[in-house]
């Protein structure tokens, strides 16, 4: 699963996920893309589950790029522990997703195969997504 190799700080504040994606919102590497139109958080497990179902569906054909990286640690206290006594330990990592963010890209396959692979991947994700095609010449 994806997680940072090292970080400056071990724990992070929750923060807010506002606005729309200004970077990473175009098809840059492949021919087809899966773009977020909803807002939310993707865990490393969800990103990996979607990647697996896509690569299995395209069967050694084509190439898949993951355009998001889970770099925000989420801490959690153990069960039945009283409040206080500091912040819990890091449980997993998430990627904050804003509308317009490109999640995955694919190349080397037909449009029908890519569309079906992205449909299967979107079922594994908790946010609303759409299929995008790169426009030649733009």
From Swiss-Prot:
Gene Ontology molecular-function annotations: rRNA binding; structural constituent of ribosome; tRNA binding
Cross-referenced CDD domains: Ribosomal_L16_L10e
The keyword Manganese appears for this protein: no
Annotated keywords: Ribonucleoprotein, Ribosomal protein, RNA-binding, rRNA-binding, tRNA-binding
GO cellular component: cytosolic large ribosomal subunit
Transmembrane annotation, as ranges: none
Listed InterPro entries: Ribosomal_uL16 (IPR047873), Ribosomal_uL16_bact-type (IPR000114), Ribosomal_uL16_CS (IPR020798), Ribosomal_uL16_dom (IPR016180), Ribosomal_uL16_sf (IPR036920)
UniProt KW Cell division keyword: no
Segments of this protein annotated with the region Disordered: 1-22
Bias (Basic residues) ranges: 7-17
Gene Ontology terms describing biological process: translation
Binding partners and assembly: Part of the 50S ribosomal subunit.
Family: Belongs to the universal ribosomal protein uL16 family.
Role description: Binds 23S rRNA and is also seen to make contacts with the A and possibly P site tRNAs.
Name used for this protein in its record: Large ribosomal subunit protein uL16
Source organism of this protein record: Methylobacillus flagellatus (strain ATCC 51484 / DSM 6875 / VKM B-1610 / KT)
């Amino acid at each position: 699963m994806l997680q940072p190799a090292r970080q400056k700080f071990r724990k992070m504040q929750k923060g807010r996920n506002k606005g729309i994606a200004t970077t990473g919102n175009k098809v840059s590497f492949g021919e087809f893309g899966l773009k977020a139109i909803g807002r939310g958080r993707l865990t490393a497990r969800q990103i990996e589950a979607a990647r697996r179902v896509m690569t299995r569906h395209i069967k050694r054909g084509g190439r898949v790029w993951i355009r998001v990286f889970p770099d925000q640690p989420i801490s959690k206290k153990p069960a039945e522990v009283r409040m206080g006594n500091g912040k819990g330990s890091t449980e997993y990592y998430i990627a904050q997703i804003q509308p317009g963010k490109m999640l995955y890209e694919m190349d080397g396959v037909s449009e029908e195969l890519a569309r079906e692979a992205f449909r299967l991947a979107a079922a594994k994700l908790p946010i609303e997504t759409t299929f995008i095609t790169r426009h030649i010449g733009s």
